[in-house]
Each structure stands twice: as C-alpha cells, then as structure tokens.
Design a protein with these regions (language model features):
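A conserved SF2-helicase RecA2
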Residues: 371-410, 414-418
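Short, low-complexity, intrinsically disordered N-terminal modules
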Residues: 13-15, 78
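Accessory DNA-binding and partner-docking regions appended to nucleic-acid-acting proteins
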Residues: 4, 8-13, 23-41, 390-392, ...
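Helicase motor core with emphasis on the C-terminal RecA-like subdomain
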Residues: 28-32, 36-45, 49-53, 57-79, ...
C-alpha cells in the first residue's frame, strides 16, 4: 500500500469558496487512472465546474474497481462520490441506505437531474416492485436503492445476480459496527455481498466513525485492500458552545439565541416528541415562528414542514433526531441541542448540519442534569451486557466532553483519532469565544457552577 497525506487544503467550490475540507489521510493500493472525462458529466448533471479533490479521487477509485472506504463530514459531498461513477460506468450502482425517506429523496432528486434511479422497498405495491426489478435486470437504472432488510431477503440475491451491477455503495456504514453510535443488526447481513458478488467492488461511506469503527467496517464488509479516504474532522467554521442549565435557564437561553440568529436557518434538537411539541408552543407564545418534526406526525405533515423550512418560509425547525439525514441546506447558522446527545458521534453528525456554506455557524448544547440522568436511567435498563457496556462508554465520553475544560474542537478531533496542532481554537466556549447572550446569567435563576473533569 502507498499511504500518504495530501498536503493542500481541499476547497469545496461547489457551494462556497470559503468552505474547506482538509484531508486527514489517503491510502490507495495504486493510483487510479485519470483518462476518463469526469468534468463534462459533473457540469452537465450537477452544475459544478470542478471537484473537491477528495471527491475526484474517490470517484476514480470506484471506476477503477477498487474497494473503497470514505469518511467525510456531513455535507462533504459523499453522495456525488457514488452517484457520478454510477452514471459514468453505464451500469447500476446498488446503494444500501437505512432510511426509506432518504432513499426516496435521493432517487427523486436524481430523476429531476435526468439520471435514472429507483427505490425498491416494501411500501411499493407488488406490481410496482415487479416493474422496478424488471427494469433493473434490463440495466435501465444507474442507481438502485435498497434497504439492508431488503438485501437480507433470500430472493433478493437471486434477481440481483441478473442486474448489471457496477458496485455496491453502503451509506451510513457505521451502522454495521456494534461500536458505532447507530448500530443496526440488519447491517451485519451486508457481509454476504462479498460471498455472493465477489467480483464487484464495495464502497463504504460514513460521516462519523472512530478508528475502532473504521476497522470494524473494513472487517465486516470484508473489503479487499481498500482505498481509504479520511477527511479531517476539524470544522473550523463552526463554534462549539456548551452550557449546563439550571431548571429555568434552558428555554430562556433558547429564546435569547433564536433572537440573536436573525439570518439563516436554525435547527433545534429536542430529546423527545413531547419536548418538541412543548418547545414549539413555548416559542410561538413568544413570537418566534417554529415548526415541529418528529416520527408521530403524518408523513405529509412532516414533509410539508420540511419544505416550508427549506424554502425559507419559516426559519426555525424543532425536531427529534429523525430530522436531518439527507437534508442539504447550506445556510443553517445554528444547531441547538436541548439535551445531552447519546454520543460524541451523534453530536458531531447533528451539529455538523450547521455552516455547510463555509460561513461561521454555532453549535450550541444546552443540557441539564435531569436529561443526563434520564439517559443514564435508560442505559441501566439495557439487558444485553455488551451493549450496556458500550452505551456506558459512550455516555462517559460525552459527559467528559461537556464537563471538561479542554478545547471542544480538540476533544472532538481526538475522539476520532486526529490531533489538532493549535492548543487554542478560538472557536469554542472553553477557548473564550462564548457570545454575551449565552454567558450572561438568566434573571431570577442561580447559574450553574462550572465543574471540570479531566481533559480527554
């Protein structure tokens, strides 16, 4: 293997010239050949005149038939990395994704661009499923989206053998690892791809994977001498702000913050459906328009609220973790959490939906001891010993993150195996960058005394 680190900043010209994604490490078995013209289809279908350099290398790795592992931050352009080679190959890329709604959104967007794509899932009528399978066998699709559950069905492998498959792309690949923050047992079934399609390349894509999870992904998918593309986890345009709140502080601080962010979008994450509804009502009563988004809403209502938020009709959306996957909105100026996330990985992925345009954005965590206690209570209820141990480990790491006096950026990067050179990031509350509205006391509420734990 040839292992090297690219020594230049990778500029994302597809969204904003200020946005940079720095490569952490690139490992390839052999340099991919560069003859194929990729700029013409990139310009014709996506409207971009140039790549982010990591994107082009990933595309060429797949066109060269290499197994590939990609770790790239939220909003880094991972989807294009498998959509473009699928288009250029003239065959069908089979994309495995965990959420039906996300697959449907991507397939619809591709269809609007003139790229034939389809989703095969159980929500389709039997005749519609048969039609999709027939067109797939005829090679009419450039991308075919399946859930891991669908792939696990005994009949799926049989008819997939009749499809002209270019490669398999595993989205949200961290779901395959028991050490990942979103482990899904059905993802373990994906190991059968290597058995039944030994000659086809497999590509794994994720935004948040520690070294341990990355090794697990490679092992579970049985990737052969894979090309590895690991982008830097440092999002320098984001400001991480953490505050432990006393009983009456949290909602007052939320209102302060929303009145401060008058330009751009805001996502507010609440831990439960009830808290989503309560928060929306609280904000509306104070003259701040906000929309809810959670799993108990009717599908059309969720979709309508998402569209109103995306179209700039309403600035603030309050949701559970169900909101965000696949959302491509560059102008989010703040992501605010109203409870302690279950893990650093979850927080990094959700907070990373801010500032995708490369401009400054804030990631604010307003947590309370009661929510941390509730999280610990549910971990205590887990019956599987191994899963309980992993959950406690994730819990203690996120607690150290919020309690520590170490730079927030450094803590996040260290968690993913990356060391920042700067001791003082200048872009987090620990390094003295908290805005006045967040650091000022709330009237009538005794502020929480800062408690520091050892740095990570």
């Amino acid at each position: 293997l040839c292992t090297y680190t690219v020594g230049v900043a990778i500029v994302d010209r597809s969204s904003d010239p200020k946005r940079q994604i720095d490569p952490l490490a690139v490992t390839t078995a052999s340099p991919p050949k560069l003859e194929t013209d990729l700029i013409s289809p990139l310009r014709r279908y996506w409207g971009y005149s140039s790549f982010r350099p990591l994107q082009e290398r990933i595309v060429r790795s797949l066109l060269a038939g290499h197994d590939t592992c990609v770790v790239m931050p939220t909003g880094g352009g991972k989807s294009l990395c498998y959509q473009l080679p699928a288009l250029v190959s003239g065959k069908t890329a089979v994309v495995i994704s965990p959420l039906i709604a996300l697959m449907q959104d991507q397939a619809a967007a591709l269809a609007q661009m003139g790229i034939p794509a389809a989703v095969l899932n159980s929500t389709l009528a039997a005749d519609a499923q048969a039609a999709v399978m027939g067109k797939a066998r005829a090679g009419e699709y450039r991308l075919l989206y399946l859930s891991p559950e669908r792939l696990a069905r005994a009949d799926t492998v049989g008819w997939l053998r009749q499809v002209p498959v270019a490669f398999f792309a595993i989205d949200e690949a961290h779901c395959i690892s028991e050490w990942g923050h979103e482990f899904r047992p059905e993802y373990r079934q994906l190991s059968r791809l290597r058995t039944h399609f030994a000659e086809r390349p497999i590509a794994a894509f994720t935004a948040s994977a520690t070294r341990q999870v990355r090794h697990d992904i490679l092992a579970q998918l049985q990737l052969r001498n894979p090309d590895k593309y690991i982008a830097s986890f440092h999002r320098s345009n984001l400001r991480y702000l953490v505050r432990e709140c006393a009983g009456g502080e949290q909602m007052d601080l939320l209102v302060r913050g929303l009145r401060n962010y008058r330009d751009g979008k805001v996502i507010v994450y609440a831990p439960t459906i009830a808290r989503v509804e309560e928060t929306v009502d609280y904000l509306e009563e104070r003259g701040i328009a906000a929309l809810p988004y959670h799993g108990k809403m009717e599908t059309e209502a969720r979709k309508r609220n998402q569209e109103r938020w995306m179209s700039d009709e309403v600035r603030v959306l309050v949701g559970t973790i169900a909101f965000g996957l696949g959302i491509n909105k560059a102008t989010v100026r703040a992501v605010i959490h109203l409870a302690l996330p279950k893990s650093i990985e979850q927080y990094y992925q959700e907070a990373g939906r801010a500032g995708r345009d490369g401009h400054s954005a804030d990631c604010i965590l307003l947590w309370q001891q009661r929510d941390a206690g509730l999280l610990a209570f549910f971990i205590g209820k887990i019956t599987d010993a191994a899963e309980k141990e992993r959950s406690w480990e994730r819990y203690h790491i996120i607690r150290r993150f919020v309690d520590s006096n170490a730079c927030r950026h450094r803590q996040i990067c260290l968690h993913f195996g990356e060391r920042l050179k700067r001791e003082d990031c200048g872009a987090c509350d620990v390094c003295g960058s908290a805005p006045g509205w967040l650091s000022a006391p709330v009237e009538g509420v005794r502020p929480k005394r800062k408690r520091f734990a050892p740095a990570v």
